Amino acid sequence: MRSRSIAVALAVAALGLVAAPRPATGGGADKPWCSDEVVELSDHVCYADGGPSPNGRRTLIVYLHGMLVATPGFQYVQQRALAREAKARGFTVLFPTSPLVKDGYFWPTSAAAQKEQEPAILAGIERSRAALAERLGHPFDETFVVGFSSGAYYASSLAVRSALDVDGYIVLAGGSSWARPADANAKRAPVYVGVSASDGQTATHSRSFAGTLAALHWPYRVEERPVGHLVDDVFLAHGLAWLRYRKRASEGRSDAGAP
């Protein structure tokens, strides 16, 4: 089944924890950074265009990957899985890459690492968003961040600190509960938290993050499923539907509907 295929693919990735694409440095001597199923936008940045949603809106998802080891081609598993989801659910997915540190590619989760690495990360994401819109020839109606595993811990911090100008977050298999708003008047983008209840490593962290959002009176939704350390496609579908609903409702659209 399709649900099982994405689950198995991303579980494997976690455990290891525009013309034609050209090779990007860092993918290995004989491997480009971007897989055949996605397109290279710039060095270590890929994308897949799944087209508009069923109602014609253009959705951009910025995907913050789970831990990647430096083995050439290892990143392809997550790229391919999200590219399939983009086609199935009608969105464009942008794949930035975290900094390369001692043991692989990880997003910064400590305050010290964020202070050192975050300015370049955020600037790179903003450049890539603009370049992608130019490449495709259209702007996006809504932009959401999806963070998985290492990317979930970082995305949760970005959300609470309102560090990116986006319309919502989907945080899967992880979450940091220590971050606090830097500006009480900053935009509070809604957050969907998917708790992988069968993952002993992250379930408690995800629940704690949801508790932090509740204490902050943040717009959020939390859902638990008996799944392990993976990007569950049910979480992704539910989170995307909810965020799309929130965005349409915020625009006062009569067709917002309930997710």
Tell what function each PLM region has.
Residues 57-60, 88-93, 139-142, 164-168, ...:
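Loop/turn elements at helix/coil->beta-strand transitions in domains of secreted/extracellular proteins
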Residues 33, 39-42, 56-136:
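Serine-hydrolase catalytic machinery in alpha/beta-hydrolase-like enzymes
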